[in-house]
Swiss-Prot record:
The chain crosses the membrane at residues 3-23, 57-77. This is ATP synthase subunit c, chloroplastic. F-type ATPases have 2 components, F(1) - the catalytic core - and F(0) - the membrane proton channel. F(1) has five subunits: alpha(3), beta(3), gamma(1), delta(1), epsilon(1). F(0) has four main subunits: a(1), b(1), b'(1) and c(10-14). The alpha and beta chains form an alternating ring which encloses part of the gamma chain. F(1) is attached to F(0) by a central stalk formed by the gamma and epsilon chains, while a peripheral stalk is formed by the delta, b and b' chains. NCBIfam families: ATP_synt_c (TIGR01260), PRK07354.1 (NF005608). Keywords: ATP synthesis, CF(0), Chloroplast, Hydrogen ion transport, Ion transport, Lipid-binding, Membrane, Plastid, Thylakoid, Transmembrane, Transmembrane helix, Transport. The lineage of its organism: Eukaryota, Viridiplantae, Streptophyta, Embryophyta, Tracheophyta. It is found in: Plastid, Chloroplast thylakoid membrane. InterPro entries: ATP_synth_csu_bac/chlpt, ATP_synth_F0_csu, ATP_synth_F0_csu_DDCD_BS, ATP_synth_F0_csu_sf, ATPase_proteolipid_c-like_dom, F/V-ATP_Csub_sf. HAMAP family: ATP_synth_c_bact (MF_01396). GO terms for molecular function: lipid binding; proton-transporting ATP synthase activity, rotational mechanism. Its main location: plastid.
Length: 81
């Protein structure tokens, strides 16, 4: 394998995971903060807020997992060879 292609694949894999983690990380922090604020204002709605929060966190985490899948494909099933 060409060393330049191997180096580019490793760099691209790192960027894929890193950039795919930034957005969901910020979103999860914001969502958790807003959920805590909502529970503090309306303690009786805690179950509904918690359920919605956990579902939305799972959807946000899926974006990071997609970035990981792309990185693994670049590293082990190298499409550039």
């Amino acid at each position: 394998m060409n060393p330049l292609i191997a180096a580019a694949s490793v760099i691209a894999a790192g960027l894929a995971v890193g950039l795919a983690s930034i957005g969901p990380g910020v979103g999860q922090g914001t969502a958790a903060g807003q959920a805590v604020e909502g529970i503090a204002r309306q303690p009786e709605a805690e179950d509904k807020i918690r359920g919605t929060l956990l579902l939305s966190l799972a959807f946000m985490e899926a974006l990071t997992i997609y970035g990981l899948v792309v990185a693994l494909a670049l590293l082990f099933a190298n499409p550039f060879v």
